[in-house]
Amino acid sequence: MSQEKKVFKTEWAGRSLTIETGQLAKQANGAVLVRYGDTVVLSTATASKEPRDGDFFPLTVNYEEKMYAAGKIPGGFKKREGRPGDEATLTARLIDRPIRPLFPKGYRHDVQIMNIVLSADPDCSPEMAAMIGSSMALSVSDIPFQGPIAGVNVGYIDGKYVINPSVADKEISRLDLEVAGHKDAVNMVEAGASEITESEMLEAIFFGHEEIKRLVAFQQEIIDHIQPIKQEFVPVERDEDLVEKVKSLTEDKGLKDTVLTFDKQQRDENLDALKEEVVGHFLDEEDPENETLVKEVYAILNDLIKEEVRRLIADEKIRPDGRKVDEIRPLESEVGLLPRAHGSGLFTRGQTQALSVLTLGALGDYQLIDGLGPEVEKRFMHHYNFPNFSVGETGPVRAPGRREIGHGALGERALRYIIPDTQDFPYTIRIVSEVLESNGSSSQASICGSTLALMDAGVPIKAPVAGIAMGLVTRDDSYTILTDIQGMEDALGDMDFKVAGTKDGITAIQMDIKIDGLTREVIEEALEQARQGRLAIMDHMLHTIEQPREELSAYAPKVVTMSINPDKIRDVIGPGGKKINEIIDETGVKLDIEQDGTIFIGAVDQAMINRAKEIIEDITREAEVGQVYHAKVKRIEKYGAFVELFPGKDALLHISQISQERINKVEDVLKIGDTIEVKITEIDKQGRVNASHKVLEQSKN
């Protein structure tokens, strides 16, 4: 890497973009400092000197948000950053996906991309700056990389597409799209949307690609100026004689029939048996541990299986389980499985099954997101779990990994736009999707199961959402798009294109590919085929439950909304929270108070809600001239008695207003604790209340 500082400048969405090389992190294979507005990101690329054994590419992308970048000190006891949060993990995945397909086939060196956010301007996306930084760090390094790539954020506001919208613009945008690619094609898409049509989404993707091409050209100018020298990488060539021998054996053993097995587990067993039988022909009894040859034969077998699956799909239009290319697996769904849960939905598609369980909580049960931007209170959460038994395997039980976090977030994005507003449904909602079986498209099954759970719980959603995963197999100059891909098609195909939405439009998409990129024609066809599949799945779901239930579960908390004068909020809370804690201790309710005086009272027991409401009404009640109260004598003075109209509000009952008859001493008529009927006669400018019992006597007479 060059040791001399060089600075390159351009503009990006109306803000300055600067890329610096040669000054920082010079021991990395490649490093750049990206300045986008006031956002500053350091991106580095490092590769191991020796390749790793195995048949996968060991790429790791990290994205670290330093709290000092936003002028914050981390919370917690240690006051330092811990493991990356969900948002940072999602950004790392976002960067990984467009970069991964652009390394040479067979490259097995460990590659680590590090992105450290040093300064964060929320209106100048650190995530998109890190994507460009990752591309440039690889491009100026000696690591083989067939980039550069770039990514942009696209919004859709008042019928117009916007590149890298500001935080304020995102609040009113119908679309939050991240798209990445190189100069020739798009190779990554991630979006959440408010029922965007397929044509609107397609236009947004390629509107973003036009800006990507400009950013890629800018990066190419930097690369041409620096002229990095790349490592020489020569992929390992297969022994052609060995390949032909293994191929002949697989044909003799019936590879085609083995692949065309409906049941996933039976297919896996048949393929394992075929592999063992073929490998057995190459085992040397005198050298039974000839690992190199055995590994080579296994690798060839995997290549042949992949090629056969792709050939069957591309040439014969036959899928491993016998389906047509646009056919959806058998569907089953059910709601209300769990009597004590607030809502539940079971969705099964072929050998993929997700159980989604919904819990309703008070608004105060929100999740607080404290990142580089302003704190966010999240009141809708979707979590995704993928246990080992779902694929018939054993293994350690760990905390959610990147994949689980990513799939949970995708489901959350797909459903976020149908969740009712707080004013219409004052609850925090958490859905947990447990994948019980998996043979591909489990994230989309979790979206369908979650929609069922929402409707079972009685959540007044704006519209039901269904999800489907599309696949792609390219062969020579032709391509085949697959509807509802299973695990083998995902693993051996070229694309995993997930699309979720309502009958009227898309609410989320996510596209991962293993080839260089996709043309407009392929994406357009995939979106239309996905729409047809999505509508078919939704039709099935609506036969299970047509609309949200009219009543919530008996075990769900009930929430009552009331409004008070904002000036009275401090009276409800009390000094140091004393009053509100007394209410909570007495009734067991959860109270959430908004700045405008809206109060949400939540509890399972309606009687306790009513009691809490009564207490708050007493605290915040305003005395009115002309109103009659049964007041209690609290204090006696020479000039009259102070009576409590209701908790927190006293009035002066002057001695002259106690009776029609003349009274010498208040104590002759009243004592502390007595109850007396009084009428409010005056409230002065200072809020002091005067009452009279005499006027009531006069009116009776």
Curated annotation (Swiss-Prot):
Swiss-Prot/TrEMBL GO biological process terms: mRNA catabolic process; RNA processing
Enzyme Commission designation: 2.7.7.8
Alphabetized PROSITE patterns for the sequence: KH_TYPE_1, S1
Cofactor: Mg(2+)
Cross-referenced SMART domains: KH, S1
Catalytic activity: RNA(n+1) + phosphate = RNA(n) + a ribonucleoside 5'-diphosphate
Keywords associated with the record: Cytoplasm, Magnesium, Metal-binding, Nucleotidyltransferase, RNA-binding, Transferase
Subcellular location: Cytoplasm
Top enzyme class: transferase
Keyword Cytoplasm in record: yes
Domain KH: 557-616
InterPro entries hit by this protein: ExoRNase_PH_dom1, ExoRNase_PH_dom2, ExoRNase_PH_dom2_sf, KH_dom, KH_dom_type_1, KH_dom_type_1_sf, NA-bd_OB-fold, PNPase
Keyword Hydrolase included in the entry's annotation: no
Residues that, per the record, bind Mg(2+): D490, D496
Chief subcellular location: cytoplasm
Residues in S1 motif domain copies: 626-694
Similarity comment: family membership: Belongs to the polyribonucleotide nucleotidyltransferase family.
UniProt-listed PANTHER family: POLYRIBONUCLEOTIDE NUCLEOTIDYLTRANSFERASE (PTHR11252), POLYRIBONUCLEOTIDE NUCLEOTIDYLTRANSFERASE 1, MITOCHONDRIAL (PTHR11252:SF0)
Functional note: Involved in mRNA degradation. Catalyzes the phosphorolysis of single-stranded polyribonucleotides processively in the 3'- to 5'-direction.
HAMAP family: PNPase
Protein name, UniProt field: Polyribonucleotide nucleotidyltransferase
Lineage: Bacteria, Bacillati, Bacillota, Bacilli, Bacillales
